[in-house]
């Protein structure tokens, strides 16, 4: 009887246990899921397929629109850019979490169709995925071009090019007739001096300036091709966000234009590479430019699976693009702000006169002692960062500010809002360089202080910070020390930002009247 009962009850007991375990796991997993998965709020107004992309067609500056959305949704919220989910953040604490605790996860920079087509796809150090290849190229770039030792070695080259451009500037602003004042297009001049220095350091060439006669046709062609490259690179492509709409890019002709430009860029770089290869064994080490260095070491590097010539061309192109437009834009903003804050300009000139006097030009060795000048540069980069939005992509699931973030999610840091946070900065909309001499004196722009990130942060921070700062300080000091600057009728400068491009350009020209204030022999 007991055996029969046991035989009867056993299957029921087993079935009951299985059912209980199943139901327990079902409900507990749902409970745990609901408890664990907490995502950042999603902004309303997304369209099918396009997501929130339609919001960026209003003409409003993206960083200002996203800043207003952050005021509504919080310092971390999500948006849909076509097929891509994007986490938008604008808080110092959250940004620090992204680039310290989760820095490895956010070490990839999303690429675009434009950069894939025109900058050698994944060979470029700017967009190649984080890994052994990126680390090797980054090391080469940092040690062979951007290290303190290398910057010291190329100091004379930089100074030589700056001298040439300032001689050109002096010739331009002479007014022997004494008639109507001569207006100098400072945006154009800043572009010339930036390009000359960068081109000389990277590939040993000088490509801009009114005094160039030899190779002028080549210089004009190069500038035309590079201007087109930068214009096309700034375009938003439907295929980057919604592949189903990729036919629109073809219809608009953007893809074919990019492919044509890529061939022109490659032809220029290939020509330079062949010239460097021919003179490889005849250039003294002290006279080598960056392309020379790349040629001498790329074969010994751990770059298996990558075409050596493509690596050299891609790396040099990335350095040129990263060092020309950006420094010129920063210098334009600095002078624009000083023209609207003449007291700061006066204070900067007094610092220069006290340190340098009026019997010689500013030299590299003076720069470290120009404390107020350094504060001016920091304050300008705080108010008008080169990149108002910093983009990354996480490789796998992680947690940010208590929110679950799925692998593949893109990160968009609103640097502009971050650097105008009233909880961090006193009077954030006011141009006040003195803040970096007092309450914010310990903050620098190298990416270690997350309140101020004009050059980015984490593993992908701009490697050329020291190069850019040394160059900008030298040009700025020479300009303010050597010239009285004024606008026509002493009007204020328009500080409107341009909505176009990846770099935060000033929308209108910067035309100034320059009057030499030192002995004429110092300009020769």
Swiss-Prot record:
Keywords: Endoplasmic reticulum, Heme, Iron, Membrane, Metal-binding, Monooxygenase, Oxidoreductase, Transmembrane, Transmembrane helix. It comes from Eschscholzia californica. The lineage of its organism: Eukaryota, Viridiplantae, Streptophyta, Embryophyta, Tracheophyta. PANTHER family: CYTOCHROME P450, CYTOCHROME P450 82C3-RELATED. Its EC number is 1.14.14.98. GO terms for cellular component: endoplasmic reticulum membrane. One of its GO terms (biological process) is isoquinoline alkaloid biosynthetic process. It holds the Pfam family p450. It is an enzyme of class 1 (oxidoreductase). GO terms for molecular function: heme binding; iron ion binding; protopine 6-monooxygenase activity. This is Protopine 6-monooxygenase. Its main location: endoplasmic reticulum. The chain crosses the membrane at residues 4-24, 232-252, 319-339. Belongs to the cytochrome P450 family.
